[in-house]
Amino acid sequence: MTKILFGHAYFLRFDRKLFEAMQPYPPMGTIVAAAVARAAGREVALFDAMLAESERAFEVALVAEKPGLVVLYEDNFNYLSKMCLSRMREAALVMLAAARRHGVRSWVCGADASDHPEPYLDAGAELVLHGEGDETLADLLKRNADAAPLDAEEYGQIAGLCLRPGSKAAVVRTPRRAVLRDLDALPWPAWDLCDIDHYRRLWLRHHGRFSLNLVSTRGCPFHCNWCAKPIWG
């Protein structure tokens, strides 16, 4: 089976204010996706950008893990990822270029990629999973799309995808999937992939206590006028 390296592009170090505040949390959305792949029988690894120095660390992980597929799965539970989209995009594109240089296929899932798939596909991503990606990822793995690319017709039968059938072709967007209602159907997050001790040390050093994230639902009950939600829906 293909080894899959999961990752995301929120580098805490790139945000000076938040880096100084030093309140890092593991990438919940990313490790849930990794758990979905693990439940499908895949070997998984994690590149956690939150605590990494730069995109160069991702290339080091590529060499060390030797994956057959990279999945950049942004942590949509982290509100900070909505406030730093341009910097996140820059980092993600560098990471995709690194995967392409090493001959590793890549898929992307995230808020920015859902709205603007073109730059990610241009940078080397084979697919963008738009909207919630859990079921789309499971569907792709069920069809063994991680082992070898499917043809455009087969991809066209899978909801929740953006792809370019050819190098100069227009982007094809398949129908959006319904929002997942039964969150209990998802596997428990793959916490073992995270360096929890590193998070604990940082919290204790800077705050004298340790805080860890959990999620009990999806969506947001608030209506902040500065948020992307009123703009993009």
Specify the residue positions occupied by each region the protein language model found.
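Glycine-rich beta-alpha loop elements in corrinoid/cobalamin-binding modules
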Residues: 29, 33-40, 45-180
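Conserved glycine-rich "GG(E/T)P / GGGxP" loop and the immediately following alpha-helix
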Residues: 11, 22, 74-86, 230-233
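Short glycine-rich His-centered loop
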Residues: 2-23
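Residue-level recognition of beta-strand->loop/alpha-helix junctions
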Residues: 8, 46-50, 231
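Structural cue for short, hydrophobic secondary-structure segments
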Residues: 6, 72-73, 226
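Radical SAM [4Fe-4S] cluster-binding motif and immediate context
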Residues: 25, 184, 189-233
